[in-house]
Amino acid sequence: MDMEKLKEILLKAKKLGFSDKQIANLLGMDEIEVRDLRKKLNIIPLYKMVDTCAAEFEAKTPYYYSAYETFVYKEQDESNPSDRKKVIIIGSGPIRIGQGIEFDYSSVHAVLALKEMGIEAIIINNNPETVSTDYDTSDKLYFEPITFEEVLNIAEREKEKGELLGVIVQFGGQTAINLAMKLKNAGVNILGTTPENINAAEDREEFSKLLKKLNIPQAEGGTAYTKEEALEIAKRIGYPVLVRPSYVLGGRAMQIVYSEDELIEYMEEAVKVSEEHPVLIDKFLEDAIELDVDAVCDGESVLIGAIMEHIEEAGVHSGDSATVIPPQTLPKEIIDTVIDYTAKLARALNIVGLLNVQYAVKDGVVYVLEANPRASRTVPYVSKSVGIPLAKLATKIMLGKKLEELIKDYDVEKVAEKVWIAKPKYVSIKEAVFPFQKLPGVDPVLGPEMKSTGEAIGIDKDFGRAYYKAQLSANMELPIVGNVFISVRDRDKKHIVDVAKKLHELGFTIYATEGTAKVLRENGIPAILVKKISESPNDNILKLMRDGKMHLIINTSSGKKAKSDGYYIRRAAVDLGIPYITTIPGAKAAVKAIEAVKTGELSVYSLDELDARIKNRF
């Protein structure tokens, strides 16, 4: 085929919206080869301005989209790169379960930091529902897909004039992080933690080697490329195991597996989901307390923004579990160990910017579950809880500022050489916000696969009041009087006794199914027997719920059976707007909240007043 004909076909494909990657797949080529060919043929995107003022007067803060509409390039491109120093921030793209609006918070704070430093802030994002894509947030906005092709196109265009200092990938969630190495190989400077160190944290085998070298405990595990390897690893470390594909966000395709049959079934599903990456198998630490830590590092000094204790048990995805700052049940030696491990990891990975580390504590041993060399979904929560803008600090560090200088204005405590931790003034609780009302038929039970799409915060002087506020913020108003229905799986029956006892003391009337009612009565707690759905199709718990006689539902899942009684009860609670709880730790926290509200007032602050109190201004 002659070059003119090739040029005509390739241009037509680009006009129709085919990406370089799609064209490469169709032709059996590499994406870079298609890119090089396209550029050789002078098929280059131009950027058109969206006039935010509708031609009424000149747009001062325009934003752009790409188009392939002509061979004439320079005359029709409207992006007009400035001659300033500039930085590109990659946004997080569409909101979906696992990657939500929380990441946009970090992108916006990065823009604010760059503006304070006199550097032009350029955002690439394609989600109109975010603050970062408001045309007056950044100096320049490119409304483009978060892909290697589009980011590199924009970087090359902006390099033509002024000084492009680099690209920030830390604030765009996993989508942006996955582009780091390819962009570096294409000659783009990645600001902050290097792509090699990002990979050392993201690649499970590399990270496992690092933990061994640092003498930091980790849950036993392995990487399987076949069903046979998976069965062998699970047999070696013992069931239950947590299985998941590599490189995921939001716990997609993640599952706790209790037997060989379950594992075989999972492998047949997950390997199809994840052909490019192997399946990871870890020992599941039952009844462990999970922790999250958000930290900022300049390669040497470390600031720990907060240690967050998960309220739900291990096995509930970190994005779905309620968390509390400061930790409520951990002894000082555990806190000290977590601080030590976080600082060691930050330095070993040479983190420049943000780091999130997830831990599990079992039998006094602190295990590292994973480290994420990027902004986590908890950065807004931590920043608001302790009054320190972590994303802002991280951005300034990426551009050469030293952490020790930046934290002088904040209330932090030095806990080791070049290690500080923020001092929270209040109890702050994050609660997940779920979309179940908009998803008919979905079981609201919590597990390792993430289901939430947002989060809310409750802040007060003690745990109970803060938890009550967090539930209110997440659209779940806990009752302080009324009827409670309790039905829990066998392994939870001994743990529900204290919860039921407290609810009875607080004046609630308890309804329960046969097995749960028997255990409660044996422990001196009166319970009204309610028939299961399968026992009586017309006179059962669902009828009581529909008649408005139930004010709180406590129901834990009994297993994998898709349409169990528990499923119908939980689903009815969602549809009828009845507060429901699906974990024992969640039930214990709710009881503390109800007791706190029954015995005292909730503290009420304006946002300005609360912000000033958190920052120690009065």
UniProtKB/Swiss-Prot annotation:
Keywords: Amino-acid biosynthesis, Arginine biosynthesis, ATP-binding, Ligase, Magnesium, Manganese, Metal-binding, Nucleotide-binding, Pyrimidine biosynthesis, Repeat
Cofactor: binding comment: Binds 2 Mg(2+) or Mn(2+) ions per subunit.
Carbamoyl phosphate synthetic domain, as annotated region: 79-477
Catalytic reaction annotation: hydrogencarbonate + L-glutamine + 2 ATP + H2O = carbamoyl phosphate + L-glutamate + 2 ADP + phosphate + 2 H(+); hydrogencarbonate + NH4(+) + 2 ATP = carbamoyl phosphate + 2 ADP + phosphate + 2 H(+)
Region span, Oligomerization domain: 1-78
EC number: 6.3.4.16, 6.3.5.5
SMART domains documented for this protein: CPSase_L_D3, MGS
Keyword Ubl conjugation appears in the UniProt entry: no
Any one biological process term the GO annotation gives: L-arginine biosynthetic process
Molecular function in Gene Ontology: ATP binding; carbamoyl-phosphate synthase (ammonia) activity; carbamoyl-phosphate synthase (glutamine-hydrolyzing) activity; metal ion binding
Known pathway: Amino-acid biosynthesis; L-arginine biosynthesis; carbamoyl phosphate from bicarbonate: step 1/1; Pyrimidine metabolism; UMP biosynthesis via de novo pathway; (S)-dihydroorotate from bicarbonate: step 1/3
Binding site for Mn(2+) 2: 370, 372
Residues covered by the MGS-like domain: 476-618
Cofactor: Mg(2+); Mn(2+)
Binding site for Mn(2+) 1: 358, 370
Transmembrane segments: none
Binding-site residues for Mg(2+) 1, renumbered to this chain: 358, 370
Positions annotated to bind ATP: 244, 283, 285, 290, 315-318, 358, 370
Class in the EC hierarchy, top level: ligase
Domain remarks in the Swiss-Prot or TrEMBL record: Corresponds to the C-terminal section. The large subunit is composed of 2 ATP-grasp domains that are involved in binding the 2 ATP molecules needed for carbamoyl phosphate synthesis. The N-terminal ATP-grasp domain (referred to as the carboxyphosphate synthetic component) catalyzes the ATP-dependent phosphorylation of hydrogencarbonate to carboxyphosphate and the subsequent nucleophilic attack by ammonia to form a carbamate intermediate.
Subunit structure of this chain's protein: Composed of two chains; the small (or glutamine) chain promotes the hydrolysis of glutamine to ammonia, which is used by the large (or ammonia) chain to synthesize carbamoyl phosphate. Tetramer of heterodimers (alpha,beta)4.
Function: Large subunit of the glutamine-dependent carbamoyl phosphate synthetase (CPSase). CPSase catalyzes the formation of carbamoyl phosphate from the ammonia moiety of glutamine, carbonate, and phosphate donated by ATP, constituting the first step of 2 biosynthetic pathways, one leading to arginine and/or urea and the other to pyrimidine nucleotides.
Family, per entry: Belongs to the CarB family.
Record's protein name: Carbamoyl phosphate synthase large chain, C-terminal section
Organism from which the protein derives: Methanocaldococcus jannaschii (strain ATCC 43067 / DSM 2661 / JAL-1 / JCM 10045 / NBRC 100440) (Methanococcus jannaschii)
Gene from which the chain derives: carB2
